[in-house]
Amino acid sequence: MRLKPSFRWSIYAAFAVLFLTGAGWLVADWQKESSIGETWQQTAAYLLMVHGGAAMATLLLLGALIPLHALRAWRAAQNRISGSVMATFNAVLIVTAFGLYYLGSETLRPWMSWIHIAAGCLLALWFPVHIVLGRRKLR
């Protein structure tokens, strides 16, 4: 199911901002013990704020994507496996983001963090696959 260009590019932009700020935060977090750790810590804080804001916008886009794209494609039996993988990665990211933000458990936090990072990286790899598979089936 092809999306209107403005909506499609909004989704691409939102996912790009999420991936870049998430990856940037990861680098900044790893560097906070360095000699200029304070700079990295401040950078990590700013990146996390942008990441959270982009996540809010992405949630709105995903909410619109369900009836406009996912449900229509599902009913037409198009790209079901690839779309299900996309939905699963997004659901894992939403649940783990909620856990990271709202759960105070120091036992669960490292697990949530690593699952969130892994799901984000895997989604970034799978997203272009989903697009290519969908376009091949439209031809």
State the predicted function of each range:
Residues 1-139:
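Membrane-embedded alpha-helical bundles that constitute the cytochrome b-like, heme-associated redox core
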